[in-house]
Amino acid sequence: MTELSVLQAVRLKGRVTPADLAVTLGDDLDGITPIVEQLTESGLLVDGTALKISPSGRARLETLLAEERSGIDSATIAAAYQDFRAVNADFKALVTDWQLKGGPAGKPNPHDDAEYDAAVLARLDDVHARVVPIIDAAATQLPRLNAYSSKLLVALGKVNDGETAWLTRPLIDSYHTVWFELHEELIGAMGLTREEAARSGDAQ
């Protein structure tokens, strides 16, 4: 478990309990406790009812991410990012159709039409099949991104087993939560801020 991976996970979550942090990092509580305690004692994390990153933690994380970016092939990451943007548009449309009937200007989906819901959810397998090779390509430069394939697969399995909350529910590693965090990672790997990405037409 690295300093970078812990700080990045906490930043992406905003606020997270140690138990939930362990889950998202693919470890157990005992496994992450030493590094969490170290980062808290050094002032990089703030421990209260939940963990959050401190201003000095953000500065340290930016340094670590910049060091990480300095060793990557930027062309490979740029290609992965562009490929992701295309799949992201389709995933956003899927989520919109799950939440609203009739598109962005439609009405909230009451989920009382099993055939409609099944047709929307059926599109998730295609989205997943398209995003996994993109993650694989990005992970040749940033191996820690491999974890996103595993987390998306777990969420996909739960959705396909009928636990549809795992498509979009916040505060758990739902498909949408993990997707959002992967998007943030790719934006960061490009050396962009979210605002800069949005100006280029890449909105979440």
List each language-model region with its residue ranges.
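A short, conserved structural fragment
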Residues: 40-50
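Short, amphipathic alpha-helical interaction segments positioned at domain boundaries
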Residues: 58-86
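Intrinsically disordered, low-complexity terminal tails/loops enriched in metal-binding residues
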Residues: 15-17, 75, 79, 100, ...
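Short amphipathic alpha-helical interface segments
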Residues: 1-27
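Short amphipathic alpha-helical interaction segments
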Residues: 25-41
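Minor-groove-contacting beta-hairpin "wing" of winged helix-turn-helix DNA-binding domains
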Residues: 49-59
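C-terminal regulatory/effector modules of DNA-binding transcriptional regulators
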Residues: 154-204
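Exposed, interaction-prone assembly regions rather than primary DNA-binding/catalytic cores
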Residues: 75-164
